[in-house]
UniProtKB/Swiss-Prot annotation:
Signal peptide start and end residues: none
Gene Ontology CC terms: cytoplasm
Keyword Transcription regulation part of the UniProt annotation: no
GO molecular function, one term: single-stranded DNA binding
Protein source organism: Pseudomonas syringae pv. tomato (strain ATCC BAA-871 / DC3000)
Protein name in the entry: DNA replication and repair protein RecF
Gene name of the encoded protein: recF
Length: 367
């Protein structure tokens, strides 16, 4: 799948524009602050209904504009296309449209337009809180396991009920026991989905990483959020008093984590920033391979400021791996020459010059 058309209005400093991207490689180049990252942000908004630069969408809306809007036409792998649209105004009203119909949730966007983001903050996947790694893990499970979303919703409902009971004691014993059973059932299913996903991801990740950088002894493991030798029901019963004191459930899938270690050490404590970026790139490219194996279609990769913290050899290796995925890629850089020569001669490459919010599609030398 790929975006064949993107229209952006009212996003940060960007002038209204309609782009016709290449189905493969798209390079956005220009000076710092010109608006390159805002183009990626607009595409991210279209696919996830969130910004990767701000937890709030109000700052995304251009100064003195009433709203921001992004439309896109997605060419589907199975043929045909789907039209997506997102809009957010200053009053907080958010609208998602799919093929002319209002959508119920952003998950419907994500299912049609799976996006992967690689940017200067990517190292947070290793250094940041477990929540970031759970989001990474669950993105992958969501795109390969059709039952994940409904099970996840069951888990969240049961967890919310239990936490409310822990804080306020509003349930009778029978109701509390029923919600605990539902929590344990949903937790076991989520754990099963996650374990199966990590089992599939590990060999692909290890192969991908070996083509990017040599890191002997790096291991990836999964912690499910409670003792692997015990049933969750047993753990919940034994930790009930402490859970009541804390006001929330301390064991379960909501405490899961991915652990990357180099020998006996946390990888984030040992690796350089450049090495961390390569590890994250390998993880996200491996996810793309799994998506392509399970569903007809590929992820779309948004790569912001690729040259930073990577030398020429590593940049070329990363470009080669992205190219081998045969997916659509949007990459930003200051100097197009960093990336222009990194592709095979038969790979369609489009160049976009961004200057003070204006985007001009230029011609590649292969055209």
């Amino acid at each position: 799948m790929s975006l064949s058309r993107v229209s952006v209005t009212g996003v940060r400093n960007l002038h209204p524009v309609t782009l016709s991207p290449s189905p493969r490689i798209n390079i956005l180049y220009g000076a710092n602050g010109s608006g390159k990252t805002s183009v990626l942000e607009a595409i991210h908004l279209l696919g996830i209904a969130r910004s990767f630069r701000s937890s709030r969408l109000l700052p995304v809306i251009q100064y003195e504009q009433p709203s921001c809007t992004v439309f896109g036409q997605v060419d589907l792998a199975q043929g045909g296309h789907s039209n997506l649209g997102v809009s957010r105004d200053r009053q907080g009203e958010f609208q998602i449209r799919i093929d002319g119909q209002n959508a119920r949730s952003a998950a419907q966007l994500a299912e049609i337009l799976p996006l992967q983001l690689i940017n200067p903050d990517s190292f947070r996947l290793l250094e940041g809180a477990p929540k970031i790694r759970r989001q990474f893990l669950d993105w992958g499970v969501f795109h390969v396991e059709p039952r994940f979303m409904s099970t996840w919703q069951r888990l969240q409902k049961a967890l919310k009920q239990r936490n409310s009971w822990l804080r306020h004691g509003t349930l009778d014993a029978a109701s509390q026991a029923a919600w605990d059973r539902e929590l344990c059932l949903a937790s076991d299913e989520i754990d099963e989905f996650r374990r199966a996903y990590i089992k599939a991801l590990k060999p692909v990740f290890e192969k991908t990483l070996s083509e990017l950088v040599e890191l002997e002894g790096l291991t990836l493991s999964y912690y499910r959020g409670w003792d692997k030798e015990k049933e969750l029901s047993t753990v919940l019963a034994s930790s009930l008093n402490r859970d009541q004191q804390m006001g929330h459930t301390q064991a379960g899938p909501q405490r899961a984590d991915l652990r990357l270690r180099l020998g006996a050490h946390n990888a984030a404590d040992i690796l350089s920033r450049g090495q961390q970026k390569l590890v994250v790139c390998a993880l996200r490219i491996a996810q793309g391979h799994l998506v392509s194996q399970v569903r007809r279609g590929q992820c779309i990769y948004l790569v912001d400021d690729l040259p930073s913290e990577l030398d020429d050899n590593h940049r070329r290796a990363l470009c080669r791996l992205l190219e081998e995925l045969r997916c659509q890629v949007f990459i930003t850089c200051v100097d197009q020459e960093f990336l222009r020569e990194g592709w095979q001669t038969d790979t369609p490459v489009a160049l976009f010059h961004v200057e003070q919010g204006r985007i001009t599609q230029t011609h590649d030398h292969r055209e």
